[in-house]
């Protein structure tokens, strides 16, 4: 005997944040069957909007959560009485992003960044970036930074650094403005480069010394000319991109300072012409390598750092004090701020993303846990067009897209709400489900730009751009 199907109806008020998709006033409150699912409600909305011949797939949210079942199942699971009027929001469903193009490198691509009208560096540059003139920055394990156009042409490549024969692999690179680039890596040095669009050159303008081991990450703030670096030596350093504002560099950290073994390099290269400076401040407190560092989006006097010691720390930069420490259960590999929710997203070695409320008043460490990756999550960025979107890059060879409203049940005690990804992007040319959790296709860096799309780089020696059709 088949189970009885409920014919209960419930009152629902439909709203949207898209000004072009508002329903007529008389159609905003409807009596709907609780048997309906998302696809049924999407069809009804298209009919009410007069879009039968040009349908838009809609996602449906009830009380801020995606509807993934029937309305009846949602009401039962959340303990909502059918007599309650539901507040239903409809929004364009996120279309799976398609591969637009890929750019080949000679070595692994460790980091990517985008300069566009809508990027932070574009905004810091006073609107000088024109539509159609977007630039992509890449850092590679060959020790070089490159600037590309969106057609895949290399516009400029930096010269190999004069670093005394140290390992030159880069780990991080950021646009500071349309004319300045900051990059750092395994030779312990943070470099500021001048990018000249007219001559298509990238030249080193400043070298910054503070770390004794490799630099894992850099963060930049254009308006204040400040740079943060996170290092494997367990420290964080603060610099200025203006040479005169920094102190003299420690002589013990300079390459070719006294080493006789580098005599041949000294003879073959001119004396140092690039200014060398030290740090304004060095922050200690982590007990293991610091993997990531960011400025607080609305207050550049505050920074957050993530470490293999399982902690997220909040720093007051003017006083060089750690003002808060949040301890998790796993090594933290990446960071991203979500200002609209007052949360910090942290990628972990345990394959998930933990959303942490860093405010001192917060009583719960993990507000939400996002699961879906099969290896460490090493790069994060937010959706530039939404307060709810997040993108992650992992050593499992995938980039995953998340919507924080996509909440599921279950999970372990203390992990808060659970979320799962809405789309997965594989490396272009990767056949089948993938090579053993990212073998040969690890993703090292990802950026989400409103104009360019989702840009990622990795072990396959490629920059890959994905974008939703029509965006």
Swiss-Prot record:
WD repeat segments: 119-158, 165-203, 210-249, 285-325, 327-366, 372-412, 436-471
Region (Disordered) residue spans: 245-274, 412-440
UniProt cross-references to PROSITE patterns, sorted A to Z: WD_REPEATS_1, WD_REPEATS_2, WD_REPEATS_REGION
Pfam families per the UniProt record, alphabetical: NLE, WD40
CDD domains from the UniProt entry: WD40
GO molecular function annotations of the record: ribonucleoprotein complex binding
Superkingdom of the organism of origin: Eukaryota
Cellular compartments per GO CC: nucleoplasm; PeBoW complex; preribosome, large subunit precursor
Composition skew (Polar residues), residue ranges: 253-262
Keyword DNA damage set for record: no
Biological processes, Gene Ontology terms: chromosome organization; maturation of 5.8S rRNA from tricistronic rRNA transcript (SSU-rRNA, 5.8S rRNA, LSU-rRNA); maturation of LSU-rRNA from tricistronic rRNA transcript (SSU-rRNA, 5.8S rRNA, LSU-rRNA); protein-RNA complex remodeling; ribosomal large subunit biogenesis
Region (Ubiquitin-like (UBL) domain): 10-92
Keyword Transmembrane part of the UniProt annotation: no
Keywords: Nucleus, Repeat, Ribosome biogenesis, rRNA processing, WD repeat
Compartmental location: Nucleus, Nucleolus; Nucleus, Nucleoplasm
Protein family (similarity comment): Belongs to the WD repeat WDR12/YTM1 family.
Reported function: Component of the NOP7 complex, which is required for maturation of the 25S and 5.8S ribosomal RNAs and formation of the 60S ribosome.
Subunit description: Component of the NOP7 complex, composed of ERB1, NOP7 and YTM1. The complex is held together by ERB1, which interacts with NOP7 via its N-terminal domain and with YTM1 via a high-affinity interaction between the seven-bladed beta-propeller domains of the 2 proteins. The NOP7 complex associates with the 66S pre-ribosome. Interacts (via UBL domain) with MDN1 (via VWFA/MIDAS domain).
PANTHER family: RIBOSOME BIOGENESIS PROTEIN WDR12, WD40 REPEAT PROTEIN 12, 37
Protein name: Ribosome biogenesis protein YTM1
């Amino acid at each position: 005997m088949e189970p009885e199907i409920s014919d209960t109806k419930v009152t629902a008020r439909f709203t949207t944040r898209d000004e072009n998709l508002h329903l007529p006033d008389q159609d905003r409150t409807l009596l709907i069957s609780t048997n309906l699912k998302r696809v049924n409600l999407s069809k009804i909305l298209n009919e009410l909007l007069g879009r039968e011949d040009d349908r838009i797939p809609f996602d449906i949210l009830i009380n801020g959560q995606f509807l993934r079942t029937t309305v009846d199942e949602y009401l039962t699971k959340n303990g909502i009485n059918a007599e309650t009027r539901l507040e239903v929001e409809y929004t364009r469903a996120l279309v799976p992003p398609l591969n637009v193009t890929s750019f080949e490198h000679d070595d692994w691509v460790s980091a990517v960044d985008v300069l566009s009208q809508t990027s932070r560096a574009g905004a810091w540059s006073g609107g000088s970036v024109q539509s159609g003139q977007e630039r992509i920055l890449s850092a590679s394990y060959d020790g070089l930074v490159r600037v590309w156009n969106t057609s895949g042409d290399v516009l400029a490549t930096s010269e190999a650094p004069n670093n005394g024969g140290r390992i030159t692999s880069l780990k991080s690179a950021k646009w500071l403005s349309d004319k300045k680039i900051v990059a750092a890596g395994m030779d312990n040095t943070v470099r500021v480069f001048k990018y000249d669009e007219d001559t298509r050159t990238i030249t080193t303008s400043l070298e910054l010394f503070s770390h004794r081991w490799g630099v894992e990450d850099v963060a930049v703030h254009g308006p204040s000319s400040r740079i943060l670096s996170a290092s494997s030596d367990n420290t964080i350093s603060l610099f200025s991109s203006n040479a005169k504002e920094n102190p003299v560099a420690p002589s013990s950290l300079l390459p070719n300072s006294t080493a006789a073994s580098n005599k041949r390099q000294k003879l073959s290269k001119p004396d140092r012409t690039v200014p060398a400076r030290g740090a304004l401040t060095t922050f200690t407190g982590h007990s293991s390598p610091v993997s990531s560092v960011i400025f607080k989006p609305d207050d550049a006097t505050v920074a957050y750092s993530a470490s293999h010691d399982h902690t997220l720390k909040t720093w007051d930069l003017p006083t060089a004090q750690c003002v808060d420490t949040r301890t998790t259960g796993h090594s933290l590999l990446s960071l991203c701020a979500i200002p609209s929710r007052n949360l910090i997203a942290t990628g972990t070695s345990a394959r998930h993303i933990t959303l942490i409320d860093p405010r001192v008043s917060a009583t719960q460490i993990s507000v939400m846990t996002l699961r879906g990756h099969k290896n460490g999550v090493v790069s994060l960025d937010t959706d530039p067009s939404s307060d709810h979107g997040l993108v992650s890059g992992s050593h499992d060879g995938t980039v995953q897209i998340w919507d924080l409203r996509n909440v599921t049940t279950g999970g372990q005690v203390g992990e808060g709400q659970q979320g799962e990804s809405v789309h997965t992007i594989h490396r272009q040319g990767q056949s089948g489900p993938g090579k053993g959790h990212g073998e040969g296709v690890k993703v090292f860096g990802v950026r989400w730009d409103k104009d360019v799309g989702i840009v990622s780089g990795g072990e396959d020696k490629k920059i890959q751009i994905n974008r939703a059709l029509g965006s």
